[in-house]
Amino acid sequence: MVLTDRQRADLHAGIYEYLQSRGDAYQKVVEALAQADPECTIPHTTTTSNGSSAGLTKTPLLEKKWTAIPRLQKKVLELERQASHHAKIHAHRSAAGSGGGALEANDGAGGARRLLPRLPCQHTLQGHSSVVTCVRVHPVFTVVVSGSEDGSVKVWDHESGEYIRTLKGHTNTVNGLAFTPTGSHLASCSTDLSIKLWDFQTYACIKTLRGHDHTISSVVFLPFGGDLLTTTKCKRLLSASRDCTVKVWDLETGFCDQTIHDHNDWVRTLATRADGSVWASAGNDTVIYVYEQDRMKKAVELRGHEQVVESIAFLTQDTIPKNNAQRPSKHIETVRDYLVSGSRDRTVRLWKVSEASCLMVLKAHDNWVRSVLIHPNGNYILSSSDDKSIRVFDIKNERCLRTLENAHNHFVSSLDMHATLPILVSGSVDQTIRCWPLD
């Protein structure tokens, strides 16, 4: 590489400055360099883009040039990573626009691969100092948030496995997390009796809601008048608590609009349909109550579990492929009418809400079922348990299709899955979050 006169002069000046700062050990070299190139002894000045002098440099020139290279390399890598993320998001959105939005992949024979989680995990995220109680995947970006008994909410990149930051504000266990449909805001709830709303662009806590008399177990945003994927703003939030109530919050005022007292014991979990028209709650009294948003009154009671209901999820139109032939179950006629639940009785149940009937009972776990969710393609139920496993159930055939044994070193407390990106995330009592690839 041939240096220009200006580059050569800068290099000589930098070497002269560096050697001179080392003391008498390099005095002869300094004198020789000054004799060979007298201009290198002139104090170095920086110039602005318009050519005017900006004054003497404060940072030694050679060190500045030396450290600039890795700094620029790091910046290039970060920009490449961001470009890759945006390209993937664009590709998945394009696929969703033409294929119903569900996670699918061609198997090369004209069919769709199942895209189910597999061993080994892609990343193990470590940083919490206590039990991980909840995880939630960002609806757009390759980001996952986790809540813990250490009182913190941590933000991670689930693609690279990198830690991003910690959201501090709660003073006790964080039990639940929820994103708005666009991912612009995050809600967290805690044993400290508070709900916090976070601006997820600035990571600032913008509002704290108080009103429950005991541990707050779960929160969920309640869309109104639009689909979950297109509603840009949620005006209401639901919260469930050990005080046996569910509260409905107005997010603009920060006040509680309504308190629902139907449960007679700890309310542990909440779920809502994509359009917010129907939502459900469940907990220690083993009953699942389903409500209509327009009336905010109990519409259906689902009974059958023998112990605490830990988790519920709706099987909604958004999880079903557009091709009716691919609907997930022989039972299902109106897919918006179905709900899945997991319980400490070690079972996973599928319910037909309108008939208040249990369609199937899936028995495979050897301990409490802690979390359930519906695969985005609508064909599978995923569950995690205190038996340390993650299981995948085939709804159509009513059987356990895949098991990730010893997915964690302790109870698997929480699961979440991205709607379009091929990633499953789990949280555990072993204080870690694990990211599972799908194939």
Swiss-Prot record:
Domain of life: Eukaryota
Major subcellular location class: cytoplasm
GO molecular function terms listed in the Swiss-Prot or TrEMBL record: dynein complex binding
Any one Gene Ontology BP term: microtubule sliding
Keyword Iron-sulfur: no
Compartments where found: Cytoplasm, Cytoskeleton; Cytoplasm, Cytoskeleton, Microtubule organizing center, Centrosome
SMART domains per record: WD40
Matching PANTHER family: F-BOX AND WD REPEAT DOMAIN CONTAINING 7 (PTHR19848:SF8), WD40 REPEAT PROTEIN (PTHR19848)
Protein name: Lissencephaly-1 homolog
Species assigned in the record: Phaeodactylum tricornutum (strain CCAP 1055/1)
